[in-house]
C-alpha cells in the first residue's frame, strides 16, 4: 500500500492536498511492461524522496532539464528525448502500466537522457525538484474535467502556475497542450493572471505546435476529423 497525494483545488484555485491510498496492482501490467520495469528501473527510475534531487549526479552531466507531467504511455516523451540528446528529460506518471510502457520503449531506443518517476506529480514538484532548476515543464493533454462542476479538479490553477514558475529557470517555459478548447481558454485565463510569466504567442493566445512536441497518432486522427489542438507556452520572466 502506498500513500500518494492527488491534487484538488477550491473555487479560487487554492491547492487542497488530499492523501489517498491506492494499491499498486501488479496484475494490471502486461508481461512486457513488468519486464521493462525490472530491466530498466535501476538505470532510469527515480524513487521519490522529499529532498531535492541533484540533477548533475542523476544524469552525470550539466544540461538543461525538461520535465513532463503525466506522460501517459511515454511514447512521445521517449521520442523527444531521443531527438534532443543534449537535454535531460524527467517524466512523472502515476499509472504503473504507463511507466512500464515508457521504460520498454526507452530501452529499445537506447536513450540515456531520460529518468522517470512513478509518483504523484504535485508531491515530486513540491519536494524533489529544486527551485529554478528546469528549462521547460510540459503538460500535454491533462484531464479536461469537462463538466463545469469538476473544473476545480483541473490541474492548471493559480497555485499550480506559481509552483511551476518557481521550478523554472528565468527564461524557462511552461508548455501546455489540450484538445479541449474550453480548457485552453481556462489555461489562458489562469496564466494571463499569473505573475512572472509572459505569453510566447505574438497574438497573446495560442501558438503553433512547436517542433519539439511530436504529433501523436491520436492527434493526427483528430486533425483528420477536424478536431483542434491548442498549444500554450508561457515564459518565466521574473
UniProtKB/Swiss-Prot annotation:
Instruction: Name the positions where S-adenosyl-L-methionine binds.
Output: 68, 93, 120, 143
Q: What InterPro entries does the annotation carry?
A: SAM-dependent_MTases_sf, tRNA_(Gua-N-7)_MeTrfase_Trmb, tRNA_methyltr_TrmB_bact
The source's domain of life comes to Bacteria
> Which residues participate directly in catalysis?
143
| GO CC, one annotated term | tRNA methyltransferase complex
This protein's record includes keyword Transferase: yes
Record field: catalytic activity: guanosine(46) in tRNA + S-adenosyl-L-methionine = N(7)-methylguanosine(46) in tRNA + S-adenosyl-L-homocysteine
Annotated positions binding substrate: 147, 179, 216-219
Q: Which SUPFAM superfamilies does its entry note?
A: S-adenosyl-L-methionine-dependent methyltransferases
Q: What is its EC number?
A: 2.1.1.33
Provide this UniProt record's keywords sorted from A to Z. Answer: Methyltransferase, S-adenosyl-L-methionine, Transferase, tRNA processing
Q: Name one GO molecular function term.
A: tRNA (guanine(46)-N7)-methyltransferase activity
Q: Which Gene3D superfamilies match?
A: Vaccinia Virus protein VP39
Question: What family classification does the UniProt entry report for this protein?
Answer: Belongs to the class I-like SAM-binding methyltransferase superfamily. TrmB family.
> Per its UniProt record, what NCBIfam families does this chain match?
tRNA (guanosine(46)-N7)-methyltransferase TrmB
> What is the protein name stated in its UniProt record?
tRNA (guanine-N(7)-)-methyltransferase
Biological source species? Shewanella denitrificans (strain OS217 / ATCC BAA-1090 / DSM 15013)
Protein's gene: trmB
Amino acid at each position: 500500500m502506498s500513500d500518494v497525494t492527488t491534487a484538488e483545488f477550491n473555487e479560487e484555485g487554492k491547492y487542497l492536498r488530499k492523501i489517498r491510498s491506492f494499491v499498486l496492482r501488479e496484475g494490471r501490467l502486461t508481461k512486457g511492461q513488468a519486464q521493462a520495469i525490472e530491466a530498466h528501473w535501476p538505470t532510469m527510475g527515480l524513487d521519490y524522496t522529499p529532498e531535492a534531487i541533484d540533477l548533475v549526479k542523476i544524469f552525470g552531466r550539466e544540461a538543461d532539464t525538461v520535465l513532463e507531467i503525466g506522460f501517459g504511455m511515454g511514447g512521445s516523451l521517449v521520442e523527444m528525448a531521443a531527438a534532443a540528446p543534449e537535454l535531460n528529460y524527467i517524466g512523472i506518471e502515476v499509472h504503473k502500466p504507463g511507466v512500464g510502457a515508457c521504460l520498454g520503449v526507452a530501452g529499445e531506443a537506447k536513450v540515456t537522457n531520460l529518468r522517470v518517476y512513478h509518483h504523484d506529480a504535485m508531491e515530486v514538484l513540491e519536494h524533489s525538484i529544486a527551485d529554478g532548476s528546469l528549462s521547460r515543464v510540459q503538460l500535454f493533454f491533462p484531464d479536461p474535467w469537462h463538466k463545469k462542476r469538476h473544473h476545480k479538479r483541473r490541474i492548471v490553477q493559480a497555485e499550480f502556475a506559481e509552483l511551476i514558475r518557481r521550478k523554472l529557470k528565468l527564461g524557462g517555459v511552461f508548455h501546455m497542450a489540450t484538445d479541449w478548447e474550453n480548457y485552453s481558454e481556462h489555461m489562458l485565463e489562469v496564466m494571463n493572471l499569473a505573475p512572472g510569466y509572459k505569453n510566447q504567442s505574438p497574438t497573446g493566445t495560442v501558438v503553433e505546435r512547436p517542433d519539439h512536441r511530436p504529433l501523436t497518432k491520436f492527434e493526427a486522427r483528430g486533425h483528420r476529423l477536424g478536431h483542434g489542438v491548442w498549444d500554450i507556452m508561457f515564459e518565466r520572466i521574473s
